[in-house]
Design a protein with these regions (language model features):
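An alpha-helical appendage that flanks or caps ligand/catalytic pockets
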Residues: 1-106, 136-178
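C-terminal helical cap(s) of enzyme catalytic domains, especially alpha/beta-barrels
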Residues: 121-142
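C-terminal, well-structured subdomains that either form a transmembrane helix-short loop-helix hairpin
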Residues: 94-125
Length: 178
């Protein structure tokens, strides 16, 4: 989640939480992890107790979400983090803060791309384009050259010169719009 400043991005995140259904989030998490959070008190600190999977998520969030270092990771706090974009690592802040986080992941893990999730549509995408893209572009880490300029994702991914349509050996090739 990105905005003009770290404070504005955090405020945006906090604002979105008012729309989250934490009971529903707990149910989803139970399905994802096999852990029923109802078995834990609201005061347990998941940074130190509970399943290892939750402790790993807490460590990832603490490393990437500004202002969370040293916080007590109670059940309500864990559910709030899960409610907006799930269990994924989060990058919340100004363009510089978010770009620093993404660049650290690139450097440390050698990754060459991201699947960015969204909290609202088109809002999250508009914020990325308005705030984050210029910062990444200025750093030279925003990919803008592709094998087929203006081509489809399929053309870019396959890079086989066969155009944007599904390939003949794909089941969908039997169907076309006429």
């Amino acid at each position: 989640m990105v905005d003009e400043t770290d404070e504005k991005a955090e405020a945006k995140f906090q604002d979105l939480l008012q729309y989250a259904d934490l009971e529903g989030t707990a149910a989803l998490f139970g399905g994802w992890s096999g852990t029923d959070l109802a078995n834990f008190s609201d005061d347990d600190d998941f940074a130190f107790t509970g399943p290892g999977a939750i402790q790993s998520m807490v460590k990832a969030w603490t490393a990437t979400v500004p202002g969370t270092e040293g916080l007590k990771w109670t059940k309500p706090r864990v559910l709030e983090q899960l409610a907006i974009s799930g269990a994924h690592a989060k990058a919340i802040g100004s363009p510089k803060t978010v770009a620093d986080i993404l660049q650290r992941w690139i450097t440390e893990a050698g990754i060459d791309g991201f699947n960015l999730s969204y909290a609202t549509t088109p809002g999250t995408f508009e914020d990325m384009i308005k705030y984050l893209w210029p910062e990444l572009r200025a750093r030279g880490v925003l990919q803008e050259d592709y094998p087929v300029p203006g081509g489809s994702m399929r053309e870019t991914f396959l890079a086989d010169g066969q155009g944007p349509r599904v390939r003949a050996d794909h089941p969908a090739a039997a169907y076309s719009w006429k």
